[in-house]
């Protein structure tokens, strides 16, 4: 199974599928359609039914039930796009057999080294087969590892008809990394009672809580005048932007928070004297705290509007997704089945909140409760991203075991 997974995964990551928030089309980039069409062909070749891609880049397929029991239809999902944080073009995966626990030189010329000194969890992978980057791109394990694992699990179930299961639906979605993954997802057509995203990190991750999330875009309009004659006339929008940021709690940023703590994150700032634009994301697990954070942002803007004028500072704030716990707790048995599946395989479930979001965050509010399970990847979204093939095999086994458990408990 290891060779199958390596072959699939290394093929997928070589297709540039980085999404693009500045584009309104779905999918936002053509590479996502390229990979989607490849996946449809592969789904058909392994024997999946109804494999197709729609005009928006959503791939769906079915593995029919092979049991006489009345088993709920379950789904497994992964996303085809990679993050905007770091380039995903010309990915050149490196395979490290039987990792020795020492530094891994990713790129000698650029002096890029993946070291246990910087990433202590790396030491725990001694003896594993690892796949890394070449130090110039991200890897794309988020979320092409999930695609490879779902594909391999379906292939395994088809080749082992003695394993009884209900109907299984599979979907590969576009534009998850820019928050649009489920926007055009047809829940009715998918027709599953429950689903799992295979979009987590290290071995054993099982998540059914996500942030409540909002984005805030602020435009500040200044007044540029020659600095030699600027007294009483110039309004420096960049300085107002600095002032705005100072009105937010300095210690409530991603670099200072963990666990259930929320934050304000200044994603980008672009500007000059005449105009400055700030892009924040706001995150919190607790609904009331989430509302309070948005109010804090509004008050900061209003304070500056009162000082500089209503029309000089414009706030565009909108909710992105909500904590899926509220929709999953009423059907907590789907989390318990995944937990049991891991325990049956000798894997310790690590149930923790996602300090982020998945497609499941939105899908759960669209009527498809969708917790998240691990892929085996580490250090997503950058050149130090890597994944254990050994743990990818375990993710495949968990998918198969979840299918078995739903049938056994029906």
Curated annotation (Swiss-Prot):
Database matches in Gene3D superfamilies: 3.30.70.360, Zn peptidases
Predominant location: cytoplasm
Reaction(s) catalysed (UniProt annotation): Release of the N-terminal residue from a tripeptide
Pfam families for the chain: M20_dimer (PF07687), Peptidase_M20 (PF01546)
Gene Ontology molecular function: metallopeptidase activity; tripeptide aminopeptidase activity; zinc ion binding
GO terms, biological process: peptide catabolic process; proteolysis
Binding site for Zn(2+) 2: 142, 177, 381
EC number: 3.4.11.4
Cofactor(s) annotated in UniProt: Zn(2+)
Annotated Zn(2+) 1 binding sites: 79, 142, 199
Record text on cofactor binding: Binds 2 Zn(2+) ions per subunit.
Keywords for the protein's UniProt record, in alphabetical order: Aminopeptidase, Cytoplasm, Hydrolase, Metal-binding, Metalloprotease, Protease, Zinc
Active site positions, chain numbering: 81, 176
EC supergroup of this enzyme: hydrolase
Subcellular location: Cytoplasm
InterPro entries named in the record: ArgE/DapE_CS, Bact_exopeptidase_dim_dom, Peptidase_M20, Peptidase_M20_dimer, Peptidase_M20B
Cellular component, GO, one term: cytosol
Function as written in the Swiss-Prot or TrEMBL entry: Cleaves the N-terminal amino acid of tripeptides.
Protein family (similarity comment): Belongs to the peptidase M20B family.
Database matches in HAMAP family: Aminopeptidase_M20 (MF_00550)
Protein known as: Peptidase T
Source species of the chain: Bacillus subtilis (strain 168)
């Amino acid at each position: 199974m290891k060779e199958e997974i390596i072959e699939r995964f290394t093929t997928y990551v070589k297709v540039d599928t980085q999404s693009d928030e500045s584009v309104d089309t779905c999918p936002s980039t053509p590479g996502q359609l390229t990979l989607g069409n490849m996946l449809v062909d592969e789904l058909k070749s392994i024997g999946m039914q109804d494999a197709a891609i729609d005009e928006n880049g959503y791939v769906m397929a079915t593995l029919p039930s092979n049991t006489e029991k009345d088993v709920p239809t379950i789904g497994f999902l992964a996303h085809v796009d990679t993050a905007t944080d770091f380039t995903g073009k010309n990915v050149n995966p490196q395979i490290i057999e039987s990792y020795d626990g020492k530094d891994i030189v990713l790129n000698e010329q650029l002096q890029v080294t993946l070291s246990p000194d910087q990433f202590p969890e790396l030491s725990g992978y001694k003896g594993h087969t690892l796949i890394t980057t070449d130090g110039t791109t991200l890897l794309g394990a988020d979320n092409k590892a999930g695609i490879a694992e779902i594909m391999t699990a379906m292939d395994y179930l088809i080749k082992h008809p003695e394993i009884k299961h209900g109907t299984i639906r599979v979907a590969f979605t576009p534009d998850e990394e820019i928050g649009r993954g489920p926007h055009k997802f047809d829940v009715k057509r998918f027709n599953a009672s429950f689903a799992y995203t295979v979009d987590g990190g290290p071995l054993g991750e099982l998540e059914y809580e996500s942030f409540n999330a909002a984005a805030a875009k602020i435009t500040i309009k200044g007044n540029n005048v020659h600095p030699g004659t600027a007294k009483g006339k110039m309004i420096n929008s960049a300085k107002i932007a600095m002032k705005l940021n100072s009105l937010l709690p300095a210690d409530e940023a991603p670099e200072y928070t963990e666990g259930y703590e929320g934050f304000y994150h200044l994603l980008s700032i672009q500007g000059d004297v005449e105009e400055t634009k700030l892009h924040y994301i706001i995150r919190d697990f607790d609904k009331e705290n989430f509302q309070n954070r948005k109010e804090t942002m509004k008050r900061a803007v209003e304070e500056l509007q009162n000082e500089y004028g209503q029309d000089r500072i414009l706030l565009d704030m909108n909710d992105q997704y909500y904590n899926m716990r509220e929709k999953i707790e009423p059907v907590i048995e789907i989390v318990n089945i995944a937990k049991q599946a891991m325990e049956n395989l000798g894997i310790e479930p690590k149930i923790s909140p996602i300090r982020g979001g998945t497609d499941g965050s939105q899908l759960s509010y669209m009527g498809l409760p969708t917790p998240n399970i691990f892929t085996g990847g580490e250090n997503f979204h950058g050149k130090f991203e890597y994944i254990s093939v050994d743990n990818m095999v375990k993710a495949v086994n968990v998918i198969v075991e979840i299918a078995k458990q739903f049938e056994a408990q029906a």
